[in-house]
């Protein structure tokens, strides 16, 4: 230990080994604590009073391709949850989100969407009591419409630690609802699409995963057929065998 | 000087670089990701991730789950983006994802390529974030953004190897 | 051969390194000719790992991850195999600093090491790879480094040869 370089190296080596050891210990303690607090089976939650609503959107930002009608869904819900057991000294933040899982068209296909999420930073804010909470996001499916399918709603959480692995889980509470269906009188709105100028967008080679719309009512179909000639072959819906 | 001595000295210096590189490549193969350790560069995932945090990725999951934090790159652009999966749709062949940064008001639709509505889980993802170290990556931000720092560090490494005989 | 330079008497590592460097000269004086087979093997293995790493680097620059995946796996596998071989070679020749042959064809292997803070040069001399004809000697650095830090070849050669002759006599 007679010169700076050797001393520096020795210190660095020691620092490295000790920090690895410390981190491993921290992670082990955190996980043990979480197991102890039974966080993977939080049953002090309830979700209910889900009232779904649906609307038709035509903008790309709401899932529409080429200004075709796209069904968007939102829900309102009540939520009670006590997530205080997720907070320990190694918890930096907890991300909670309300998801809805519903089936797709073919066997083995499934979808899961987030309607609402929230970042909880401290233990004091970890008790949630929401009444008639509006969903944060307007949700659309890969298909053109939700077809009134049944969805299972869950409250899921994600612990972001100060150091270590990200931890995920879901609470025991579940609820179900059926997606709202658009009333038939909306047909008038769909007919208007015929008069809209076909928007020819640049087809680049990297176009990915274009989802073909479901068979749509007659009047609009003709307009769309005119458009389709100019487009690249559109890919099949997710639940059928993809072309490429 | 003796050529054998010179070669031996060269080898001990080269060893530092070759072993570091081999470890990096092995990590990439094990995790199936071309960049298994990333440093957070933007604030779009705050307060979870800050600039300078180190993320450890894993890319051998069959499917991503809603709520997972993933790193993806849009085809044709080399910028990795770290965001959370907001929605997923899958069948037995593939999975499509929609992502959003926690600190952003809207989802990532505007970040994708033109006309791209979803990410493909198999081809667009660099990996999903499994673990996290705070702030230590700031050194690499300094190295990439501050030229003097980079060469200073390299120089220090070389000197320290040449001077050690233990 | 390194020209005589002042060695830091407080660094056991420096003392040992300097003595190692002077071994070939000392043994030449005792009638041995150095064999470079081990050194060359180590260098060759080392260079091949550098070559592989270099190749990997070039591939990494040129091709993207998915394309180069299996080549990378293969190259890494070869790298680790060679590293393993190097590990074994080094283990079997632990601390060997000199291998030479006498005019009569007798092989001498000299291993030398130091413990971290003791200024003692441990020397293990083996003849003809025979574990029975091995002697280990402890040569304090003080005996062949003078007060100012200069290496004394005469003192070292004398000290070394006295130990070697002990075994030589035993052999014959």
Swiss-Prot record, chain B:
EC class name: hydrolase
Database matches in NCBIfam families: sigpep_I_arch
Membrane topology: Single-pass type II membrane protein
Gene3D superfamilies assigned to the protein according to its UniProt record, in alphabetical order: Umud Fragment, subunit A
SUPFAM superfamilies noted in UniProt: LexA/Signal peptidase
GO MF terms, alphabetically ordered: serine-type endopeptidase activity
Catalytic activity: Cleavage of hydrophobic, N-terminal signal or leader sequences from secreted and periplasmic proteins
Name this protein carries in UniProt: Signal peptidase complex catalytic subunit SEC11
Cytoplasmic compartment segments: 1-9
Record's subunit section: Component of the signal peptidase complex (SPC) composed of a catalytic subunit SEC11 and three accessory subunits SPC1, SPC2 and SPC3. The complex induces a local thinning of the ER membrane which is used to measure the length of the signal peptide (SP) h-region of protein substrates. This ensures the selectivity of the complex towards h-regions shorter than 18-20 amino acids. SPC associates with the translocon complex.
Active site: 44 (charge relay system), 83 (charge relay system), 108 (charge relay system)
UniProt key word Protease: yes
Localization terms from the record: Endoplasmic reticulum membrane
Domain of life: Eukaryota
E.C. number: 3.4.21.89
This protein's domain notes: The C-terminal short (CTS) helix is essential for catalytic activity. It may be accommodated as a transmembrane helix in the thinned membrane environment of the complex, similarly to the signal peptide in the complex substrates.
Transmembrane segments: 10-30
Pfam families: Peptidase_S24
Native organism: Scheffersomyces stipitis (strain ATCC 58785 / CBS 6054 / NBRC 10063 / NRRL Y-11545)
Function: Catalytic component of the signal peptidase complex (SPC) which catalyzes the cleavage of N-terminal signal sequences from nascent proteins as they are translocated into the lumen of the endoplasmic reticulum. Specifically cleaves N-terminal signal peptides that contain a hydrophobic alpha-helix (h-region) shorter than 18-20 amino acids.
Segments in the Lumenal topological domain: 31-166
UniProt GO cellular component terms: signal peptidase complex
Main location: endoplasmic reticulum
GO BP, sorted A to Z: protein targeting to ER; signal peptide processing
Family statement: Belongs to the peptidase S26B family.
């Amino acid at each position: 230990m007679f010169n700076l370089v050797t001393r520096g190296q020795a210190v660095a080596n020691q620092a490295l080994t000790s920090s690895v050891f410390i981190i491993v210990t921290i992670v082990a303690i955190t996980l043990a604590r979480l197991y102890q607090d039974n966080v993977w089976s939080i049953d002090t939650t309830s979700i209910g009073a889900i009232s779904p609503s649906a609307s038709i959107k035509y903008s790309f930002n709401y899932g529409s391709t080429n200004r075709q009608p796209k069904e968007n869904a939102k829900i309102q819900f009540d939520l009670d949850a006590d997530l205080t057991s997720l907070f320990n000294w190694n918890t930096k933040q907890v991300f909670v989100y309300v998801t809805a899982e519903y089936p797709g068209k073919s066997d083995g296909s499934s979808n899961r969407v987030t309607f609402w999420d929230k970042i909880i930073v401290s233990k004091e804010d970890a008790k949630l009591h929401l009444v008639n909470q509006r969903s944060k996001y307007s949700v659309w499916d890969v298909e053109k419409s939700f077809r009134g399918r049944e969805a299972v709603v869950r409250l899921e959480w994600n612990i972001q630690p100060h150091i270590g692995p990200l931890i995920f889980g879901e609470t025991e509470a579940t609820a179900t609802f059926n997606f709202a269906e658009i009333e038939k009188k909306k047909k008038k709105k769909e007919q208007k699409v015929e008069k809209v100028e076909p928007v020819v967008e640049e087809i680049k080679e990297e176009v990915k995963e274009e989802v073909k719309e479901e068979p749509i009512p007659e009047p609009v179909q003709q307009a769309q057929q005119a458009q389709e000639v100019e487009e690249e072959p559109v890919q099949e819906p997710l639940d059928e065998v993809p072309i490429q | 000087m003796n050529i054998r001595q010179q070669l031996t000295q060269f080898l001990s210096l080269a060893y530092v670089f070759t072993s570091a590189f081999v470890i990096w490549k092995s990590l990439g193969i094990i995790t199936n990701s071309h960049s298994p350790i990333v440093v957070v560069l933007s604030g779009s995932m705050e307060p979870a991730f800050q600039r300078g945090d180190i993320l450890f990725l894993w890319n051998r999951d069959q499917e991503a789950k809603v709520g997972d934090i993933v790193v993806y790159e849009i085809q044709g652009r080399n910028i990795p983006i770290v965001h959370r999966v907001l929605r997923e749709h899958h069948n037995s062949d593939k999975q499509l994802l929609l992502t959003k940064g926690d600190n952003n008001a809207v989802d990532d639709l505007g970040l994708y390529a033109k006309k791209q509505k979803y990410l493909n889980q198999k081809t667009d993802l660099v990996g999903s974030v499994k673990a996290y170290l705070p702030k230590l990556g700031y050194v690499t931000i300094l190295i990439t953004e501050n030229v003097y720092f980079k060469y200073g560090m390299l120089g220090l490494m070389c000197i320290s190897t040449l001077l050690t005989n233990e | 051969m390194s020209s005589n330079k002042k060695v830091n008497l407080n660094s056991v590592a420096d003392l040992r390194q300097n003595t190692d460097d002077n071994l070939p000269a000392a043994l030449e004086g005792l009638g041995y000719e150095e064999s470079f087979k081990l050194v060359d093997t180590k260098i060759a293995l080392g260079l091949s790992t550098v070559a592989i790493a270099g190749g990997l680097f070039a591939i990494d620059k040129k091709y993207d991850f998915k394309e180069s995946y299996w080549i990378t796996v293969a190259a890494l596998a070869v790298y680790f195999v060679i590293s393993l071989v190097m590990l074994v070679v080094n283990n079997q020749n632990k601390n060997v600093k000199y291998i030479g042959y006498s005019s009569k064809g007798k092989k001498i292997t000299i291993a030398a090491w130091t413990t971290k803070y003791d200024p003692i040069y441990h020397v293990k001399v083996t003849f003809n790879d025979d574990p029975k004809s091995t002697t280990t000697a402890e040569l304090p650095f003080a005996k062949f480094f003078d007060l100012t830090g200069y290496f004394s070849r005469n003192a070292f050669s004398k000290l070394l040869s006295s130990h070697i002759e002990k075994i030589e006599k035993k052999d014959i």
